């Protein structure tokens, strides 16, 4: 059986990694050995941050809802408790959007929560 040298396979592997590293600074986009490490690290960051993104957005929504609720004389925790009691099922993403863009609608929701708590 004929001996197969790895030229074609190695070139393909290198091109794939260097393509993924396109736009990286300095040797990270040109030297295979460095580029491979950079691509692996980038993948680790991407994996981790896809999970962190969900936590960070939830925290942002809560901060916005809290600010809007306090402008209407209620704390975040009291607002959420009031909404649960009133059986109003609006998720935090929508509540945050209302608090920022539709202040009148958000105020009406807060008033319903207040009425349920009283």
From Swiss-Prot:
The keyword NAD belongs to this UniProt entry's keyword annotation: no
GO biological process: ribosomal large subunit assembly; translation
SUPFAM superfamilies, A to Z: Ribosomal protein L20
Pfam families: Ribosomal_L20
Keywords for this protein: Ribonucleoprotein, Ribosomal protein, RNA-binding, rRNA-binding
GO terms for MF: rRNA binding; structural constituent of ribosome
Organism superkingdom: Bacteria
GO CC terms in record: ribonucleoprotein complex; ribosome
PROSITE patterns hit by this protein: RIBOSOMAL_L20
Keyword tRNA processing included in the entry's annotation: no
Function: Binds directly to 23S ribosomal RNA and is necessary for the in vitro assembly process of the 50S ribosomal subunit. It is not involved in the protein synthesizing functions of that subunit.
Family under the similarity heading: Belongs to the bacterial ribosomal protein bL20 family.
Protein name: Large ribosomal subunit protein bL20
Annotated source species: Pseudomonas fluorescens (strain ATCC BAA-477 / NRRL B-23932 / Pf-5)
